[in-house]
């Protein structure tokens, strides 16, 4: 190390995508070494004197917080809160993948090798790539979101008499922005079902109607343009009473495509990139992804 400093070699080692294995046209796995981590879930800086030095986390784009994700506490419910919009970084990175996204119908080694420079922008770790056809809907009302509906389902299971406290208003569960969600939870085994929500990385009101219409026409003609989502499985045992699993992610590219799919009621083609092995979904991450892929994996 001293020799490296003496020679002035302080630059970061280049990212390497390794152990690339395509399991099927809808599933692949790979690892990233020396990843740039430009898009990642990171712990907030500790507050001076705090007894919880690494507690809250945020989804960050080039170090700028986009969504507050909350802690790793397994008995706390998952909740996302919009903080700010990134400086188009997600779109710039994902745009380098667009050539094959126009009508993506299968994953292959050549495709993922071609995208190595983009995958190297991710955080160091092990990943799964899933090509999915997901029934999504756009939700703009708090009472329609799974963020609130899962809370009411827990209350019903607990025998709540309907006299909900003030802090259980729908707005208190709302992430602060319209987003896309699964039309129904994914049925599971150990965990009964998985909720799903994909959050935008750009203001929804900035979507161009002409672009949405163009993608809608392509979908109607039988094409399946793909969106790119960086996501993960989050497992919780809320209040030590309720098993709860989420597939949650940030849309890196394809906001217009997802809007077109949702408006047409056609399952959305999604390339999901999911880091596995760490965080609150560490135990059930692979299990949850396998259940989602079994139901919604793109059929060859």
Regions inferred by a protein language model and the residue ranges of each:
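N-terminus-biased targeting/localization segments
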Residues: 1-38
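Short, low-complexity, polar/charged sequence segments that are solvent-exposed and flexible
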Residues: 249, 270-272, 289-292
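Short beta-alpha junction loops
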Residues: 233, 273-278
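Amphipathic, charge-rich alpha-helical segments that serve as recognition/docking helices
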Residues: 277-300
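Short alpha-helix boundary/capping and kink motifs at helix termini
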Residues: 30-250, 262-263, 267-269
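Short, conserved phosphate/pyrophosphate- and ester-handling motifs at nucleotide-, phospho-/glycolipid
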Residues: 254
